[in-house]
């Protein structure tokens, strides 16, 4: 009988330890979502959401110096935001329970950076292919961001 009680006590201690580990993992995930993902998502929106309006303004006359200057200012500000996004992404390790989510976020960030690089190339030589590719990459990144937001809602947090 004493052995059975000792076994029950050991099982209870093990269960408590596992629960503590799960709570710590949840805490790490909540912290990462709050300190890393949420600000990154906001900054991604600040880069992606103004793009259609910026492009429309430029398309009125791409050879107009003032319009091109405004578009270049948007690209520069977006580049600075993406630098902050990269620093933020690297500031805290992605919790094990969100590795796939973190990888998807990384791919989204890379796509936005690549799009901005293509758009920057466009401003240097007015080659429409760069503009088209940059626009497509941003469209893809926007879809990826939407999927991330949907996936974020499904992440299990106790």
Each language-model region and where it sits:
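Alpha-helical segments in soluble extracytoplasmic regions
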Residues: 21-95, 133-158
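Charged, low-complexity interaction regions
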Residues: 60-63, 121-131
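Residue-identity detector for threonine
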Residues: 13-14, 94, 123
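Amphipathic protein-protein interaction modules
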Residues: 97-125
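N-terminal Sec-dependent export signals
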Residues: 1-32
């Amino acid at each position: 009988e004493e052995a059975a009680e000792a076994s029950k006590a050991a099982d209870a201690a093990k269960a408590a330890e596992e629960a503590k580990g799960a709570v710590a993992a949840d805490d790490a995930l909540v912290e990462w979502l709050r300190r890393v993902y949420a600000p990154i998502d906001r900054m991604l929106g600040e880069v992606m959401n103004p793009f259609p309006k910026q492009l429309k303004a430029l398309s009125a006359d791409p050879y107009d110096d003032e319009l091109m200057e405004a578009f270049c200012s948007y690209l520069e500000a977006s580049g600075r935001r993406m630098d902050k996004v990269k620093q933020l992404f690297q500031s805290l390790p992605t919790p094990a329970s969100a590795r796939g989510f973190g990888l998807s976020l990384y791919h989204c960030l890379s796509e936005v950076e690549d799009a901005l690089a293509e758009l920057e190339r466009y401003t240097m030589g007015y080659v429409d292919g760069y503009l088209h590719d940059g626009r497509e990459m941003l469209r893809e990144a926007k879809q990826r961001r939407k999927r991330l937001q949907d996936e974020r809602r499904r992440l299990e947090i106790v």
